[in-house]
Amino acid sequence: MTLRGALAAVIAAAAAFLGSTAVATASTEPEDSTVRPLIVGGEDATQTYPFMVSLQRANGSHFCGGSLIREDWVVTAAHCVTGSAPSGVRARVGSVDRTSGGTLVGTSQIVIHPSYGQRLGYDIALVRLASPVGQEPIPIATSDGGPGTPTRLLGWGDACPAGQCGPPVTLQQLDTRIVPATSCWGINAATELCTDNPGGNAGACYGDSGGPQLRSTGSDWELVGATSRSGNNSPVCATGPSIYGNVTALAGWIDGHVG
């Protein structure tokens, strides 16, 4: 297999693992029962996260997470929105309940990183909201902090490793840390973060894609990553580290679009 073919295979397998619902049903509207955006081993959100976004189909079904980085821009995973038209995507911003609260708004533009699908490690996209929202955006960190840095993951969904439970309505959170890139399989260390699975049984899973990985400033949060895929190529969630798009490393491309 050529290098290009190998990279395409890795990217396709990764997208199928963590974002299978978003990618496979881009032209349809999945029922809630088929969506498995989860954090295994997490807990109900202990605070409000005004920047947290639930990306939804027109029928209100959640399919991916995202982070509000400007009053009218959201960063998410590219595999979440590839093949989707803005008219078929809406966003609920600033609620810990994926079914109510916050601000519900349509979207007007989807921008996929130009290297996504061509090179490993660019699973990042931007979604422009149809109108600005009043929630406070999250700043992008100037540095991811490197291995050992404590981080927090956010997401909705089934908390069972095999995806057999129903998705919770309440936002889940999990405290973890960045680990060396060598701990993850098929990772681009220049543009991605390898993130630990605490206790060997906690972490992100199917459809949790696009949701934020946060770094604490001591008094608030900064964005360092966006959920991408499994780091051990296993179909069972939380059995190994997870891979996150390194938003700090791609901040130049992001700023070029959102200003």
What are these regions (language model features)?
Residues 2-8, 15-40:
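C-terminal region of N-terminal signal peptides and the immediate post-cleavage residues
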Residues 97, 105-106, 110, 120-200, ...:
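Chymotrypsin/trypsin-fold serine protease catalytic domain
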Residues 31-57:
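N-terminal activation segment of mature serine protease catalytic domains
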Residues 3-6, 22-28, 68-81, 90, ...:
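C-terminal subregion of chymotrypsin/trypsin-like serine protease catalytic domains
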Residues 55-56, 74-77, 82-115, 178:
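Conserved H-D interstitial segment of serine endopeptidase catalytic domains
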Residues 50-71, 102:
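A conserved glycine-rich beta-strand in the N-terminal activation segment of trypsin-fold
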Residues 50-52, 90, 137, 193, ...:
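Structural detector of coil-to-beta-strand junctions
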